[in-house]
Amino acid sequence: MVADPPRDSKGLAAAEPTANGGLALASIEDQGAAAGGYCGSRDQVRRCLRANLLVLLTVVAVVAGVALGLGVSGAGGALALGPERLSAFVFPGELLLRLLRMIILPLVVCSLIGGAASLDPGALGRLGAWALLFFLVTTLLASALGVGLALALQPGAASAAINASVGAAGSAENAPSKEVLDSFLDLARNIFPSNLVSAAFRSYSTTYEERNITGTRVKVPVGQEVEGMNILGLVVFAIVFGVALRKLGPEGELLIRFFNSFNEATMVLVSWIMWYAPVGIMFLVAGKIVEMEDVGLLFARLGKYILCCLLGHAIHGLLVLPLIYFLFTRKNPYRFLWGIVTPLATAFGTSSSSATLPLMMKCVEENNGVAKHISRFILPIGATVNMDGAALFQCVAAVFIAQLSQQSLDFVKIITILVTATASSVGAAGIPAGGVLTLAIILEAVNLPVDHISLILAVDWLVDRSCTVLNVEGDALGAGLLQNYVDRTESRSTEPELIQVKSELPLDPLPVPTEEGNPLLKHYRGPAGDATVASEKESVM
């Protein structure tokens, strides 16, 4: 038995001579920690699990949903789910979708108004230009990757087998087609909504009617409002409205504070919804698998096409986008991706970029250190215009259908597919059944038959989820790149350009008490840290 070293009155071990003649003091607590290293590591594991509990629950929910769906669909008999029982089975997932969609409108409008009002017009223009450039370049890269993979893997080479098995369904279920010009005109119309209230739940879309004009049947375009939020129009209005509030100067500060407070309250709701997300995701994934009649046969027939899409999404999401992030920031991109695992899993479960937006904002701000005025300005724009996954999938599908129809694609047609996929993916968020309708636009642009889109619809439930994951990953990495740009700009300048730096005395008509926690106030504490010495109000001029 080893005797304890002598201790002083403060619990420190007696001083022992060191090799250089000095004295070393070791506390009893340090010795206990060294002796109980196993307990310390166990505490570290416990803290790590507690910190990443939501991430682990979300990933487990996806795996459990796949297992549950395969188990229920394979059991049959008494466990077979008809349409009425299936709707009850997926009800927890439906609740999650409804909760997330409830948050989208106030979150997008308030965050964009507050973000646009917090930046001077020059900084706003620079941030917007860099964001759009990043989104455009990555979408073009995704489109090129999709075309290259489809030409290399030849997913539509086995045309005879696929046509024999599902050719009848393809001829019976034609997807709605739209002229390319009308599609881009609809995009422009949705940018400028005629009614902001109806834009919250309706968007403009052109349909066609056959009319008898001078004895001939003519297809006439007819505009109508269809179900689906016009998020593109709301984004444009919110940005312009935020700039207008900034131009008002002191008169607009009260309204800016209102939108900032509204946005903070919305984020509190998001933090509550996040803990229900794993339950909803599990039942959404399981319900979609149960809904498919024969998953194994479907993969056997279209496995090469599915492989091409998923492989393209994996290459773009795990190699291309992280490489771009690393080249510009010199930071580990995979550490950044670990911080957004929860919204990525939510994107897979909900298959909606907009529904994932609240969780993505919270995670990039809290886990990856992106400033609020950047994340809440860039992420809503990215959810609207950045569709890397959709562009890649549409290019693969277009080449797949061309191979299926035994039509060759020359250089001009390939360039047309790339440009059309990049441009049409911008408006996909504002179009009901977005991905499939924009695919019809691409097929029309290169004179390919649209009747084979039914094959794409058969596996869209899986490919679309992969598209959504890639879309939201691109949004988050774009926000991280812009945060790095802002940090470098501020480090070069004594007066940061991208935040308000102009100070003025508080206005007498609108005194703001410090207890309100106003984001437009900066509080400074004295040397003792016991009282506020001065406060500045950041000008919105």
Swiss-Prot record:
It catalyses: L-glutamine(out) + L-serine(in) + Na(+)(out) = L-glutamine(in) + L-serine(out) + Na(+)(in); L-glutamine(in) + L-serine(out) + Na(+)(out) = L-glutamine(out) + L-serine(in) + Na(+)(in); L-threonine(in) + L-glutamine(out) + Na(+)(out) = L-threonine(out) + L-glutamine(in) + Na(+)(in); L-threonine(out) + L-glutamine(in) + Na(+)(out) = L-threonine(in) + L-glutamine(out) + Na(+)(in). Placenta, lung, skeletal muscle, kidney, pancreas, and intestine. Expressed in CD34-positive hematopoietic progenitors (at protein level). GO terms for biological process: amino acid transport; erythrocyte differentiation; glutamine secretion; glutamine transport; L-aspartate import across plasma membrane; L-glutamine import across plasma membrane; neutral amino acid transport; protein homotrimerization. Its main location: membrane. The chain crosses the membrane at residues 52-81, 95-116, 131-153, 225-248, 258-285, 307-328, 374-400, 461-482. The modification N-acetylmethionine is found at M1. Residues 82-94, 154-224, 286-306, 401-413, 448-460 are extracellular. It is a multi-pass membrane protein. It is found in: Cell membrane; Melanosome. Residues 334-364, 414-447 dip into the membrane without crossing it. Optimum pH is 7. The keyword Transport applies. The modification Phosphothreonine is found at T494. Residues 1-51, 117-130, 249-257, 329-333, 365-373, 483-541 are cytoplasmic. Keywords: Acetylation, Amino-acid transport, Antiport, Cell membrane, Glycoprotein, Host cell receptor for virus entry, Host-virus interaction, Membrane, Metal-binding, Phosphoprotein, Receptor, Sodium, Symport, Transmembrane, Transmembrane helix, Transport. It holds the Pfam family SDF. Na(+) 1 binds at G382, N386, N471, D475. SUPFAM superfamilies: Proton glutamate symport protein. Glycans are attached at N163, N212. Na(+) 2 binds at T384. PANTHER family: NEUTRAL AMINO ACID TRANSPORTER B(0), SODIUM/DICARBOXYLATE SYMPORTER-RELATED. Homotrimer. Interacts with ERVH48-1/suppressyn; may negatively regulate syncytialization. This is Neutral amino acid transporter B(0).
